Amino acid sequence: YHQKRLREPDKHAALKQAIRESFERNKHRYGYRRVLLDLRNQGWVVNHKLVYKLMRAMGLKAKIRQRRPYISYTGTISYIAENTLERNFTPDRLNTVFVSDVTEFKVAGRKVYLSPVMDLFDRSIVAHTVATSPSTAFTSASLAQAIKACAPEPGWMIHTDQGFQYQHSSWRTLISQHQGVQSMSRKGNCYDNAVMENFFGHLKTEMYHGEAFDTVAEFNQAIDEYIRWYNTERIQQRLKGLTPMQ
């Protein structure tokens, strides 16, 4: 019986190949749910249980998320804005509500910081800056990039935590000059900016943990590549299998 089974062709051979290609193409960043969505986008008719079973049998396991957040809050040093966003993470129009934050990496013995700005409508990263110091100029630069790229209409909103960069007059002035509204999370409440925290979790799992970067320049290039991939290729379940740019 077992000899006969071994001689029979594998009825899932083509599906296994498609699964492996999806997994490899996306640099081991996809678990079975996103592989399933990718396959369905290609025209495969298959259920999640089979994809899960085959990926386990093939030893294909996505990278595991690790969390160790950078904390920019150092107390109330200036102005604390109201939590105007109030966890309304699903605006009905593009270029109306943005979120931002800072996260920290260790690269070639140095601390490196990333400041992205996300449009909550499609969860795309519309601007980002990388620096070796989490300064006010560094965070303001990413917001200035976002304003230039998106040209939001008066009344747009930017939400952050209570980090010192966002209490600073330079950040507040930039918002008011472009007729925006500042919103801040409540003290110590990461869930008020959960979408950006979630992005950081995916980014660190999918392009940072387990990788080695010899220089900050090499790391910067990897960040640029990841954000391009995230915006144009990475499938999102909340977007029903589409990418932010689709």
Model segments located where?
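Charged DNA-binding/catalytic regions of mobile-element recombinases
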Residues: 1-246
